[in-house]
């Protein structure tokens, strides 16, 4: 994998040239390689040896808490300590100001070692959304703690009755008229320092990493509708708003208050893939964990009412590239396993002019023409998908740091290529395996 990444980064995408830009001026190939070396080592030590463990030991829910293998916690802590959660962020918030191109390449090592053991892309995407659309205090309290690994994040869109049809979202959010749970009781709901405060009720399905004990807190980003003056929900997507709903309530310094929010795990979904990560059904506001004696999950509005979907698309587009990379690395992991097996498995005799010579030792199956064909097909699908995803990452850097005309062109290209970066590897890297 390393030689392939080096070729794509330096010979094709010219990642070194990014250091000529002001944002990346402190970087060089030396620093890029140091990041790749570190990630390769952590993936080799903390991820790869436990890939089978997290596949056969699914998360377990006993009705009260979720249990995960210790290897998952160890990998989470090692990843957080590496600084990769905030690698692309500004120096002043603890980031490395690393180009997204290099960031994506470095994360490939974790995905190929064990995609199942981590869902850090959700925490990063969650925090990135808040850095763009959140208030200064929301960034400080929630996003920065996600970048450090102290908190983790989710995105809660789908619902049991609606699937992925967001226009049919039925989760409700009403202003929290009760005394503030984060202040001295005198702050009106719409003046809470963490954002306008609402109470949410509803159910969210297929939420990855929706419940675990890997981090101190879980920051749920939840799509919900605020009822109109008549008490009815606005039909379609126009009425959808976005809310921060922490598993545990916090104060304005990000400290846990000791109050559990009214978010309850109803059950875990069993999956064919990504089995080391919880996939959950979450109940918001059912009253299992009442706050201030009342049912309803406390949530803080992000952005403007009715504009939640536009905010969430910031995270969804980023997640699409991440999911595409995950599928890509599953395909490449399969290829590397196939290649290793083909190099070591003897089968059949060499064929000469007179046919097979039974006196000769068996040959490795990689020497069979049809096996070569299949291996080359796997390699083409996997490395082609990797090139596509890294090209999209390079476009992200161009959009953010390029000249105006180049940045606009990169934005347009991303609009076209981002859905492909998710869908093509998801189909053809499965075909490769």
Residues of each region from the PLM?
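A glycine-rich, basic-preceded beta-loop-alpha segment at the flavin cofactor/substrate interface
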Residues: 249-266, 271, 278-319, 339-366
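Active-site-adjacent bridging/hinge elements
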Residues: 11-20, 72-83, 100-103, 196-200, ...
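Extended amphipathic alpha-helical segments enriched in small hydrophobics
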Residues: 317-402
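Amphipathic, small/basic residue-rich leader segments at the start of a protein or domain
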Residues: 1-117, 137, 141, 182-184, ...
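A short core secondary-structure module
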Residues: 195-260
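Internal maturation/activation junctions in enzymes
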Residues: 59, 122-123, 134-188, 196, ...
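Glycine- and acidic
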Residues: 20-32, 56-61, 84-92, 107-113, ...
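Charged, glycine-rich active-site and insertion segments that engage polyanionic ligands
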Residues: 414-433
């Amino acid at each position: 994998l390393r030689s392939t990444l080096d070729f794509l980064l330096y010979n094709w995408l010219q990642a070194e040239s990014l250091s000529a830009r002001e944002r990346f001026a402190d970087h060089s190939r030396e620093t890029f390689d140091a990041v790749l070396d570190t990630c390769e080592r952590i993936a080799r030590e903390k991820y790869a040896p436990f890939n089978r463990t997290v596949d056969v030991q699914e998360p377990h829910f006993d009705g009260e808490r979720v249990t995960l293998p210790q290897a998952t916690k160890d990998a989470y802590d090692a990843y957080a300590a590496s600084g990769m959660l905030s690698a692309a962020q500004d120096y002043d918030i603890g980031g490395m100001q690393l180009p997204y191109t290099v960031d994506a390449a470095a994360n490939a090592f974790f995905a190929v070692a064990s995609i199942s053991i981590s869902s850090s892309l959700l925490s990063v995407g969650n925090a990135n959304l808040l850095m763009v659309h959140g208030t200064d205090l929301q960034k400080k309290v929630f996003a920065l703690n996600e970048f450090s690994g102290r908190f983790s994040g989710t995105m809660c869109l789908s619902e049991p009755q609606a699937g992925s049809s967001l226009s049919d979202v039925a989760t409700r959010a009403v202003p929290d008229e009760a005394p503030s749970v984060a202040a001295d009781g005198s702050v009106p709901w719409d003046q809470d320092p963490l954002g306008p405060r609402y109470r949410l009720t509803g159910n969210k399905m297929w939420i990855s990493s929706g419940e675990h004990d890997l981090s101190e807190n879980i920051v749920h980003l939840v799509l919900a509708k605020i009822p109109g003056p008549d008490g009815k929900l606005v039909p379609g997507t126009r009425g959808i708003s976005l809310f921060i709903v922490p598993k545990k309530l916090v104060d304005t310094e990000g400290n846990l208050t000791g109050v559990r929010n009214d978010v309850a795990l109803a059950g875990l979904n069993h999956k064919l893939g990504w089995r080391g990560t919880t996939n959950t059904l979450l109940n918001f506001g059912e009253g299992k964990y009442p706050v201030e004696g009342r049912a309803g999950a406390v949530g803080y509005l992000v952005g403007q009412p009715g504009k939640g979907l536009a905010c969430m698309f910031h995270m969804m587009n980023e997640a699409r590239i991440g999911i595409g990379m995950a599928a890509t690395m599953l395909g490449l992991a399969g290829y590397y396993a196939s290649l290793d097996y083909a190099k070591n498995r003897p089968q059949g005799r060499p064929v000469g002019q007179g046919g097979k010579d039974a006196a000769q030792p068996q040959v490795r199956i990689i020497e069979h023409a049809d096996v070569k064909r299949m291996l080359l097909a796997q390699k083409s699908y996997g490395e082609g998908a990797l090139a596509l995803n890294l090209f999209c990452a390079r476009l992200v850097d161009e959009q953010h740091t390029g000249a105006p005309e180049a940045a606009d062109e990169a934005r347009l290209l991303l609009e076209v290529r981002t859905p492909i970066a998710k869908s093509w590897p998801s189909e053809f890297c499965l075909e490769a395996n």
